[in-house]
């Protein structure tokens, strides 16, 4: 007699910082909030529980949207093992350059998350970067010998940046322009790495992640609800 498998739920940490690109973090959140076991928009049994994380209680995104965050960085660090997924959005290059150069606590949070042991042996945690958020992941020293993507204008800069960060002898990442890349489990760390290119491609990557953690049918359902034409692995 077959039994129904238990429902799975995932806790998501969405890392924010001043000047963050709006769609980089709101697009994954939109996809995740539509993911429910019962597909009931009025009373959803949501698969993903989302928490925004930042160094301050409020974050101004692109000087256009003020977000009240759920957790401060230090509180998130204390409860980091509770999370299954970390979303790392991007921002304008000048902002990311300045942020990375300051050796921020955000980088330590990313590194700590990526090196946590899996919650279950058969399902690693997921580190999901969008656009120039890959530079924060790179600053954590995690992009060694893996395939990644980022905004098309930042491809060469990310490769050069990681070579500097990783140092001599370390394998550089293979950086190419695709809608998203699932690199599998990191060579440095224990998390599964998913990277998305510029801005709107994170919709495709988010739907892909949902298909991996739930089902392809669920992602197709969400794309219909969102009236979005889900794109696959496009190189241009």
Swiss-Prot record:
GO terms for molecular function: lyase activity. It is found in: Membrane. Signal peptide: none annotated. The chain crosses the membrane at residues 126-146. Its EC number is 4.2.1.-. Gene3D superfamilies: 3.40.50.880. It is an enzyme of class 4 (lyase). One of its GO terms (cellular component) is membrane. Pathway: Secondary metabolite biosynthesis. Isonitrile hydratase-like protein; part of the gene cluster that mediates the biosynthesis of the isocyanide xanthocillin and its derivatives. The first step of the pathway consists in the conversion of tyrosine into a vinyl-isonitrile intermediate by the isocyanide synthase xanB. Subsequent oxidative dimerization of this intermediate to form xanthocillin may involve the cytochrome P450 monooxygenase xanG, whose expression is coregulated with that of XanB. This is Isonitrile hydratase-like protein xanA. It comes from Aspergillus fumigatus (strain ATCC MYA-4609 / CBS 101355 / FGSC A1100 / Af293). The gene is xanA.
